[in-house]
């Protein structure tokens, strides 16, 4: 029968380092394997969202998108919707920091004359049963914005 090794500080440190190295290697491997499919799924999600919020188009708005970055975290992404080369609308991937948990990512579609075609929530982490009612499957809140002309909205907060 093998004798039991006595625990020592060196033994514990070596075992801990070995476990940490194995866990880090496994985590890095999983990240490398899933990085591509996750990015592809995000692009597909954006493509579907653009299709839901703008008039009919026949170009690839995701590949023609343009980003307006305010800093590393804050940016707007514009997706031009074109029919036979003519701009028919614009989808804007934007956000709101007014959620209770994290940033809410939203896609808003406009016609070229400034009317909102539709909106959709792309990502949120709101509390189920409360804040998640912004999900189109649970509420029709976004219908209030359809056909709203942004050029006719009055500035009520006093800012220019």
Where are these regions (language model features)?
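Flexible, solvent-exposed loop/hinge segments and secondary-structure transition points
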Residues: 2-160
């Amino acid at each position: 029968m093998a004798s039991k090794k006595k625990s020592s500080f060196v033994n514990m440190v070596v075992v801990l380092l070995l476990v940490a190295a194995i866990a880090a290697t496994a985590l890095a491997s999983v990240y490398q394997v899933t990085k591509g499919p996750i990015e592809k799924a995000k692009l597909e999600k954006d493509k579907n969202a653009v299709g839901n919020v703008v008039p009919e188009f026949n170009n690839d708005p995701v590949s023609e998108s343009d980003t307006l970055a305010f800093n590393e975290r804050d940016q707007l992404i514009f997706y031009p919707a074109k029919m036979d080369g003519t701009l028919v609308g614009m989808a804007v991937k934007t956000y709101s920091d007014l959620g209770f948990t994290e940033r809410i990512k939203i896609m808003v579609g406009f016609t070229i004359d400034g009317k909102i075609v539709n909106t959709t929530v792309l990502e949120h982490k709101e509390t189920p049963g409360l804040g998640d009612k912004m999900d189109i499957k649970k509420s029709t809140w976004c219908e209030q914005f359809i056909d709203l002309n942004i050029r006719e909205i009055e500035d009520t907060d006093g800012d220019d």
